[in-house]
């Protein structure tokens, strides 16, 4: 395909429309562009800052190229862009498990860590989850167990075409934002954490354009999670409406608590498991905070306070850890 007009437009600092971004993403993911062209496009967007329309165009193509999970239930996903360098445990994955134990249907989509301590796939693999889950089984587990994890490389094989270029670029690209939004089950409800405040509206606009029923984009004072250390900025998406506001731990009934951090993968796994068992208070509170937001997105609860209370109760009563064990066993 002839992308020269699009590259010229990007080189001039101009933004792409949704359709133009879709066509560029199509050329990249189908392997029709050379590495120099791909690098030029990704660099131009990264330097200028990706727009909601550009992210939406790329997500549309990514979903089109994905192996589809044939969901028959209204499911949610919890994911973050990563890259915050905060060294926290994988809260979005643990929160997804708690949300499932508390009544939400969850299709968790994730990958190994590219730069941080460990990603969602690293955690799920560490606890014995089968990462080679076929799409039909994933859909069945969401309906019956309430939780399934799908490994991004298995469901987005086209992303492999751009991997060599991404590895050579010394900065994050639009694909770091697209990945968390490209759930192969095409869920209509998501909790998305972003590492940069500027991405709150960018991701919110993309989610609105994707036709989401309800979604939250969060940035917790430097981390791509709901923070228990201080304020979290939220962009709530309902249909095509975006609303921005700030919440503090006390607003949803949580004590101000340090976020659980780890210095090794082993410690990160251990703290996440201890949090799910209610044995690590810092981890349990942070996991419950994020799970509470997920339960709000799933419409299991009416507000964040009810969500936090239900999530913490689910952890303290042992249901969260039992759900993890059940999910791991069902995946095999």
Swiss-Prot record:
NCBIfam families the record matches: trpD
A biological process term (GO) from this entry: L-tryptophan biosynthetic process
Annotated binding of anthranilate 2, by residue: 166
Source species taxonomy: Archaea, Thermoproteota, Thermoprotei, Thermoproteales, Thermoproteaceae
Superkingdom field: Archaea
Cofactor(s) required for function per UniProt: Mg(2+)
Entry note: cofactor: Binds 2 magnesium ions per monomer.
Species of provenance: Pyrobaculum calidifontis (strain DSM 21063 / JCM 11548 / VA1)
EC number: 2.4.2.18
UniProt record similarity statement: Belongs to the anthranilate phosphoribosyltransferase family.
Subunit structure: Homodimer.
EC main group: transferase
Keywords annotated in UniProt: Amino-acid biosynthesis, Aromatic amino acid biosynthesis, Glycosyltransferase, Magnesium, Metal-binding, Transferase, Tryptophan biosynthesis
Pathway(s) where this gene product acts: Amino-acid biosynthesis; L-tryptophan biosynthesis; L-tryptophan from chorismate: step 2/5
A cellular component annotation (GO) from this entry: cytosol
Catalysed conversion reaction: N-(5-phospho-beta-D-ribosyl)anthranilate + diphosphate = 5-phospho-alpha-D-ribose 1-diphosphate + anthranilate
Name listed for the protein in its UniProt record: Anthranilate phosphoribosyltransferase
Keyword Nucleotidyltransferase found: no
InterPro entries per UniProt: Anthranilate_Pribosyl_Tfrase (IPR005940), Glycosyl_Trfase_fam3 (IPR000312), Glycosyl_Trfase_fam3_N_dom (IPR017459), Glycosyl_Trfase_fam3_N_dom_sf (IPR036320), Nuc_phospho_transferase (IPR035902)
Functional note: Catalyzes the transfer of the phosphoribosyl group of 5-phosphorylribose-1-pyrophosphate (PRPP) to anthranilate to yield N-(5'-phosphoribosyl)-anthranilate (PRA).
UniProt-annotated binding residues for anthranilate 1: 80, 111
Binding-site positions, Mg(2+) 2: 224-225
UniProt keyword Oxidoreductase, yes or no: no
Pfam families: Glycos_trans_3N, Glycos_transf_3
Binding site for Mg(2+) 1: 92, 225
Record-listed 5-phospho-alpha-D-ribose 1-diphosphate binding positions: 80, 83-84, 88, 90-93, 108-116, 120
